[in-house]
Structures are given as structure tokens and as C-alpha cells.
């Protein structure tokens, strides 16, 4: 699911841009997309039609660097790269990746949430400065769309239950491609310790929602029912009529690792716990763009189940990292733009008005 594209299209639909523009969403999952958008949005999944509309549309929004049809924008067309997060791992130029195309040639405008984030984009992809749009990601508008009480009701939890959302980054493919034998299937959790984690969470009246990466290899314990651990995928969120970011906005804390979602979560200034059990192997195999940042993360770190539960309990009891989160947020997200106005700001910077 391309969350920035969805947030942009949702804002456009809600604000009557459909009266001025035909809105088309290309996807390989039209059934799920149909649930998310009104009938005024045309949903297509045929690749030939998708390529035709990419070539013939005035504005094209993409979220991946290697989307299906890479080519120069057509005459008077704007190809807008929204990105799916500020790179943390070495990618593009820093990963010695080569393509038949130039990154700078195929995009008319490129989104970055801050000037510092833009400097990372330039290192990775050699984008020209005149293509930048500085604005936090439109998907972050959804952080305001769900309150905690409603989320607990949807999940069947009591009013006093604390909710942590766990978003592990994807690991396996990179490790396998690069011949590493120490690839974890999943950070910290195994079939041998997941019941221990569940028991410790139950004692502290905390429920952890694990949102699995779309490419995560499915493990046996994902399909087991636990009292205080819930595994979710994109389909489950669609069925609940929720987005990942509305789920994050209603949570009490985030658990993550080497994922750019941590920069988005800074906008709500809630605690973050970092799982770092494979930090050194991940660093050696993948590499970090800003290693110092991960030596000074704004939250406690956990190497095992016991440390994870203790870290969650500590940040939900006494938040000792608020100042550090605020400092990092100012670095990673442009302050002057109000949360809830990000999609609108991107449209305005492109000259698209209601």
C-alpha cells in the first residue's frame, strides 16, 4: 500500500478536486482500493491502461523509486516522487546501485520532509535542487484521524489498556541476496519466546499490535491467537477501515528499529522503543547513512524480550526522552507546516488549488 499516494488522493476527493480533475488510482489490489475511495475515483489494475494513463495524465504521483514504468515525464507533465520515507539505509548512489535511467531525469518534483532529509535524498539520488518540495509526508495527516478510545473499542480492549504498535523493517531479502547466514526471520521474537512476551504484556495490561511488512515471510506464530499480541497485515487494516497512520496516531508508543516511520511518529511526540538485537549484522550488511543517529536514538533500546517489555513499561510510566524526540523532529520534519495540512501543502506547491 502506498500511503502517501492514498493520503493525497483522499484529500483530493474530500476537497472536491474531482470536479476539476479525473482521479485515477492504479493498483494490483483493486478490491481493497475500492473500499478506500469514493466512486468518483477511477480504479484500474490493467497494466496497459496504467501505462497509458501515466503517459497521458498531467500529474502523476509515485511513491517508489523503481515503479513499474520508469521513463521521462511527457511534455508539460509533472511526475511527482512522494517517496515512502527518508532513507536510513544506504540506497542508490550510496549503495552503488546503477540503473539504465538517471533518477533526476525521471521525476519533475521530489518530496522531502525537511532540508536535512533533502540533503540525504541528494546524496542517494543526485536530485537537482530545483525539484525539491519540502513538506512532511502527506500520510502523516492520518495521525490525527483516529482516537485511542475508538481504537480500543475496535480491538475489544478495555479503556485502560495501553497500546504499542510494532513496525519492524524488512530484513530477509537483503540478507539472503548478500549471502549472510545470520539473518533473523523477525527481530527479537521467536516461537520459543513469544509466549513469554505475551505473559509479560498481559501483566502490565499492554497490547502490542505487530504490523507486518508486506514482504515479511510469514512465520507460524503469526497465525496464533494471543491475548496481548495482535498480528496485522494491510488486509486487516482495510477490513477495519483504518490506515496504518491512523493506527499509529491512536497508539501509546511505537516499537521499531531501522525504519523511517520513527521520523513520522516524532510528529505526535509519543514514546519510541528501539529493537536493536541485530544492529551490528544489519549495519555491516546494509549500512546506515547517518550512523551517529542510531548511536543516539531518542528512546530505550531492547535486545531481547525482557528488555522490550521493560522498555515499554518505562516509557509509558515516565517519558524521559521527550526533549530528544523534539530535537530530532525539528531536524527531520519541517516545523512551519501544521500537522493535518501536509497533503494540501504539497498540492499548493504544485499549483493545484481547489
What are the residue ranges of the model-derived segments?
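Catalytic binding pocket for nucleotide-activated donors in carbohydrate/polymer assembly enzymes
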Residues: 225-227, 260-332
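C-terminal alpha-helical cap of glycosyltransferases
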Residues: 336-354
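Conserved catalytic-core segment of nucleotide-activated headgroup transferases in glycan assembly
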Residues: 3-12, 138-225, 302
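Short, solvent-exposed loop/turn segments at secondary-structure junctions
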Residues: 1, 29-32, 65-68, 85-88, ...
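Active-site and donor-binding regions of nucleotide-sugar-utilizing enzymes
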Residues: 1-144
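Structural motif
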Residues: 59, 78, 109, 163, ...
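A donor-sugar binding/catalytic signature common to diverse glycosyltransferases
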Residues: 60-83, 87, 239-286
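Donor nucleotide-activated moiety binding/catalytic core segment of transferases
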Residues: 43-57, 215-260
Amino acid at each position: 500500500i502506498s500511503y502517501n499516494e492514498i493520503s493525497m488522493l483522499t484529500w483530493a476527493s474530500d476537497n472536491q478536486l474531482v470536479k476539476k480533475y479525473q482521479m485515477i488510482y492504479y493498483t494490483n489490489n483493486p478490491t481493497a482500493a475500492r473500499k478506500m475511495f469514493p466512486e468518483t475515483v477511477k480504479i484500474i489494475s490493467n497494466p496497459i491502461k496504467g501505462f497509458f494513463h501515466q503517459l497521458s495524465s498531467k500529474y502523476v504521483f509515485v511513491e517508489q523509486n523503481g515503479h513499474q514504468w520508469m521513463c521521462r515525464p511527457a511534455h508539460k507533465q509533472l511526475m511527482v516522487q512522494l517517496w515512502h520515507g527518508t532513507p536510513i539505509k544506504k540506497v542508490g548512489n550510496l549503495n552503488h546501485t546503477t540503473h539504465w535511467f538517471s533518477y533526476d531525469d525521471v521525476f519533475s518534483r521530489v518530496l522531502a520532509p525537511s532540508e536535512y532529509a533533502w540533503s540525504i535524498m541528494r546524496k542517494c539520488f543526485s536530485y537537482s535542487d530545483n525539484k525539491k518540495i519540502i513538506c512532511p509526508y502527506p500520510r502523516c495527516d492520518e495521525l490525527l484521524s483516529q482516537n485511542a478510545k475508538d481504537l480500543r473499542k475496535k480491538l475489544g480492549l478495555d479503556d485502560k489498556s495501553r497500546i504499542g504498535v510494532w513496525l519492524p523493517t524488512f530484513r530477509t531479502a537483503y540478507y539472503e541476496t548478500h549471502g549472510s547466514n545470520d539473518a533473523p526471520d523477525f527481530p527479537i521474537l521467536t516461537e520459543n519466546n513469544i509466549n513469554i512476551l505475551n505473559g509479560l504484556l498481559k501483566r502490565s495490561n499492554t497490547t502490542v499490535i505487530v504490523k507486518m511488512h508486506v514482504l515479511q515471510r510469514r512465520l507460524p506464530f503469526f497465525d496464533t491467537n494471543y491475548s496481548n499480541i495482535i498480528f496485522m497485515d494491510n488486509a486487516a487494516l482495510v477490513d477495519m477501515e483504518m490506515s496504518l497512520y491512523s493506527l499509529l496516531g491512536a497508539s501509546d508508543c511505537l516499537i521499531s528499529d531501522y525504519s523511517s516511520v520513527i521520523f513520522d511518529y516524532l510528529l505526535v511526540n509519543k514514546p519510541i522503543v528501539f529493537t536493536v538485537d541485530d544492529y551490528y549484522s544489519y549495519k555491516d550488511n546494509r549500512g546506515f547513512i547517518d550512523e551517529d543517529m542510531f548511536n543516539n536514538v531518542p528512546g530505550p533500546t531492547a535486545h531481547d524480550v525482557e528488555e522490550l517489555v521493560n522498555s515499554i513499561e518505562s516509557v509509558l510510566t515516565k517519558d524521559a526522552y521527550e526533549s530528544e524526540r523534539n530535537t530530532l523532529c525539528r531536524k527531520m520534519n519541517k516545523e512551519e507546516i501544521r500537522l493535518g495540512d501536509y497533503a494540501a501543502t504539497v498540492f499548493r506547491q504544485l499549483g493545484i488549488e481547489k
